[in-house]
């Protein structure tokens, strides 16, 4: 089983981000500084996790809102 790689997005200008799930392609809006793990509404994969600051994401950041 391969490990999912999480990265911090650069230049987060808004409070919310549109993130695309790597597993199913679903796009959902996520708070940029979450206090809990964020899972995909469609497939249940973890797409973001808290770090005490800006989130770490396993998906692709589409847009900063």
From Swiss-Prot:
C4-type zinc finger locations on the chain: 21-43
SUPFAM superfamilies given in the database record: Zn-binding ribosomal proteins
Keyword annotations of the record: Metal-binding, Ribonucleoprotein, Ribosomal protein, Zinc, Zinc-finger
Gene3D superfamilies per the UniProt record, alphabetical: Zn-binding ribosomal proteins (2.20.25.100)
Residues given in the record as Zn(2+) binding sites: 21, 24, 40, 43
GO biological process: translation
Cofactor(s), by name: Zn(2+)
UniProt-recorded Gene Ontology molecular function terms: structural constituent of ribosome; zinc ion binding
Any coiled-coil regions, as ranges: none
InterPro entries given in the database record: Ribosomal_eS27, Ribosomal_eS27_Zn-bd_dom_sf, Ribosomal_zn-bd
Cofactor remark: Binds 1 zinc ion per subunit.
Superkingdom of the source species: Archaea
Pfam families per record: Ribosomal_S27e
GO CC, alphabetical: ribonucleoprotein complex; ribosome
Keyword Lipoprotein belongs to the record: no
Subunit structure: Part of the 30S ribosomal subunit.
Family note: Belongs to the eukaryotic ribosomal protein eS27 family.
Protein name: Small ribosomal subunit protein eS27
């Amino acid at each position: 089983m391969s490990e999912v790689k999480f990265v911090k997005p650069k230049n987060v200008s808004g409070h919310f981000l549109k993130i695309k799930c790597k597993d199913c392609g679903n796009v959902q809006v996520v708070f940029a500084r979450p206090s809990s793990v964020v899972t995909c509404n469609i497939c249940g994969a973890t797409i973001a996790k808290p770090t005490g600051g800006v989130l770490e994401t396993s998906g692709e950041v589409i847009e900063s809102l």
